[in-house]
């Protein structure tokens, strides 16, 4: 006995928004899950790395200082030590704007990647908690049916002892109890399997007292309307978009035209400053032709085109999932209605047999 609860996985809005709209009784479990998840820690470290890397762009003008010293032995002049200290600072480049755009895209991509990891865990937890909730309801109904079936069996057995009922009636009543017990055992097995899935996905033990899922979560899912415009809010799609932009801006930096820097150089001979060789000024570098840089730019553009192609494919994939989602919703509604009808039919049968 298995009910499909995969509807949650196909929703294209962020389920994290649900957690922010009210106090949820399972929020502590969610927080613990986030803290214990190795995947989330890895994504958080990736974001920290991008934020550190962004300082290279923000402080592009910071001077670069280097020192160099050479020891020479000359038969006429004796031992000589030539030293040089050079400082340079970039003040303009035709690629600076693209560097900042790439930085922003990479940071946004890392943030989306972290959010996506959290969303996946949240989605998995909610999916399974909904499963537990429905199976618990079924288990409660099965328990009531079993109690009714036992009472019916006792009545039929009493009538059989009195010679009113037949032996076949007793066997049918016993068979009904066994069938209901089998269904109850199947339900309990499904619940334990779902708990195991939660532990596997989250890395933490499922609480013995259970996790309460508010009804408003299911209400929000039931009232969710499918809209293909919401595809653009899908985290996978947005992440591909940021990665594509980062690749594009990086490609545009590979073949820069002009670079202007402040440069100062101090030369020393045996620790004595050499004034005629020491200087400071502005250095302008113009890239007239560099085959390697042109190839690097073209390669970067190809990487951008690959990601754009993946975005188009992801859009079509999500659109197909939305259509499949509607079919899944209709199928699940019919399946659940069938289970409800079966339950009502069983109750009617038991009631009729009691009256008889």
Task: Give the residues covered by each predicted segment.
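Sec-dependent signal peptide recognition
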Residues: 2-10
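Periplasmic alpha-helical coiled-coil/stalk elements that build and connect Gram-negative outer-membrane
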Residues: 3, 120-233, 325-332, 336, ...
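N-terminal signal peptide c-region/cleavage motif recognized by signal peptidases
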Residues: 14-15
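Bacterial Sec-pathway N-terminal export signals of envelope proteins
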Residues: 19-66, 164-168, 172, 199-252, ...
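A small-residue-enriched
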Residues: 31-92, 229-297, 302
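Sec/SRP-type N-terminal targeting helices
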Residues: 41-45, 58-59, 91-118, 168, ...
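Regular, well-ordered alpha-helical segments
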Residues: 52, 59, 112, 119, ...
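Amphipathic alpha-helical coiled-coil/heptad-repeat segments
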Residues: 121, 134, 141-144, 189, ...
